[in-house]
């Protein structure tokens, strides 16, 4: 799309014509950066700040955004509006300055809601699978020449970005329940993949409040909108009588409106049938492993079918889907000095996400020894789901445990990496290896990993950078000892 074509798209939100400069505090995150990219391409002057540059900020700078490293009150001067991420603390100098200057301050989801207000919004929520499902929906719509705008929480590999401004009325976006801010969204179609206990501090530790918030999210749909929900999830199944909107269910269950059948996985590819009520069956090849991804694809198929997208476009999009960054992302093989090992990186940081990732690895490569490098994410999550983590992590062959990635939290006694190691060790099936930092992992792996192993780096913190490093290194005990 040329700059002239992009400039014409600014008329998409004429009601925001008084807005000149939009400033993002914490612009380097995938969610914030994605919205900033769409707005920059619409022609708005975008500025932002973060503690360090990264791939997101570099891409935004290439689009003309001005990025500040560090936070300072003067950065918000002359801003029309300030957008803040949930990670920003109340004493941030830019946030304080914006309030003193009476500049409107909105959360990320509020700005996303404004982008969606004048479009046909498709919002994807759920504890797990949001990013992949959003990416699958966006890929199908792109394959069908619907040219959607999308904002995704991870890098869509085929597009090389996590956000794109399209020329059509469609906006496909990931909806974040972590701070309940997804209630700002008013889409035409909403998907809910599953509901489990996570981010419980937001909901006062009350799971019933979390469920009620998801129902409120679905009721933000107009009466003529569409809810697409996974009936396999017991919480969602129990909520069905309370959802007062047109609803399509999907899943493995016989009573699903869109049912996945005959799932078979071979390495990284999956094949299955999809039975659709009133629309016939599809034979699907999905370029992703794991039955959980077949369910994500079923949600995307349900939305696309309901919107009149042809079967050929659906089948093509799923077969050539290139995946999402840090979602079972394969880095090929790397040398260990004891042979070649397969390297995979995954963002999953909830016990259920870790479980399905392990299952996908076992199903696709059953002959390989599974070596996991796991980094817990947040002390509160580790505390709340402690036994679940210990159970699922006991299922790998070799476990290298990192310390908890705090994400701004204070340590909680008994909810750290060493404690998890002790609990796993007490189960008697595995002897975990504790490593304090990702920088120390290569030396440990040099003495552990051998020919034919599958090394899986797992977690939402900085363990993702470790996978990229390993892919570029030739590990050997000698090189690690010499500091090479």
UniProtKB/Swiss-Prot annotation:
Single biological process term from Gene Ontology: peptidoglycan biosynthetic process
The keyword Cell division belongs to this UniProt entry's keyword annotation: yes
The keyword Amino-acid biosynthesis is annotated on this UniProt entry: no
GO cellular component, one term: cytoplasm
Intracellular or extracellular location(s): Cytoplasm
Pathway linked to the protein: Cell wall biogenesis; peptidoglycan biosynthesis
Single Gene Ontology MF annotation: UDP-N-acetylmuramate-L-alanine ligase activity
Catalytic reactions of this protein: UDP-N-acetyl-alpha-D-muramate + L-alanine + ATP = UDP-N-acetyl-alpha-D-muramoyl-L-alanine + ADP + phosphate + H(+)
InterPro entries referenced in this protein's UniProt entry, alphabetically: Mur-like_cat_sf, Mur_ligase_C, Mur_ligase_C_dom_sf, Mur_ligase_cen, Mur_ligase_N, MurCDEF_pg_biosynth, UDP-N-AcMur_Ala_ligase_MurC
The protein's Enzyme Commission number: 6.3.2.8
Enzyme class at the top of the EC tree: ligase
Residues annotated to bind ATP: 126-132
Family of this protein: Belongs to the MurCDEF family.
Role according to the record: Cell wall formation.
Record-given protein name: UDP-N-acetylmuramate--L-alanine ligase
Organism of this sequence: Aeromonas hydrophila subsp. hydrophila (strain ATCC 7966 / DSM 30187 / BCRC 13018 / CCUG 14551 / JCM 1027 / KCTC 2358 / NCIMB 9240 / NCTC 8049)
This protein's encoding gene: murC
